[in-house]
Amino acid sequence: TSPEQTSLLQEKGFHKAFALRCLPREVERNLWSQADFDSVTAKKLCELRARFWPDTVMLTPEQMAVVLGDLYSRGATIVSSERAYGIYFRKENTLYFVEMMAEDDRSAEELMEAAREKEVIVEKAVITVGAAQNLFLGEGARQEYGMIRFEGEPFDVSESYLRLMMENG
């Protein structure tokens, strides 16, 4: 969002409420790291979110398909295991994870290692996670991402995660 858009939204009662962390990381070579790879589909993403974030509020698969158009055009891939999932695309020698959920740091690392083996010429990754997510705590630069306007009594959204919104840039 541009500063002008942010100001306009603030004038309409919106407040900054959601943040992300971007984490650049080296990805180790590990032939033993295994994961499943799928094309990005709304159905698959909804299944994984329901499994890893059971209390999530999300669009239906039909509505999600519209939001995922940008990921389709970038050639995004879903990588998953029993303990983690991520959505990534490759640009040159870097994997860009635009969403990742894992039980712990090691599970996330295993996904990145498996993706490195699949993509071959990759050495590093940039991971985007919610600011309050427990993955790689203390790492990464915080970036404001979303805004909210409460219609009634405000409530705490500091632990909330908002991602894969419809963006125009």
Describe the function of each predicted region.
Residues 10-96:
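Amide-forming acyltransferase catalytic core, primarily the GNAT-like/NAT-type
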Residues 42, 105-108:
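Residues at or immediately preceding the N-termini of alpha-helices
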Residues 2-31, 101-105, 113-169:
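Active-site/acyl-donor-binding loops of N-acyltransferases
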Residues 76-81, 85-88, 95-101, 109-118, ...:
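Flexible loop/N-cap segments at domain edges
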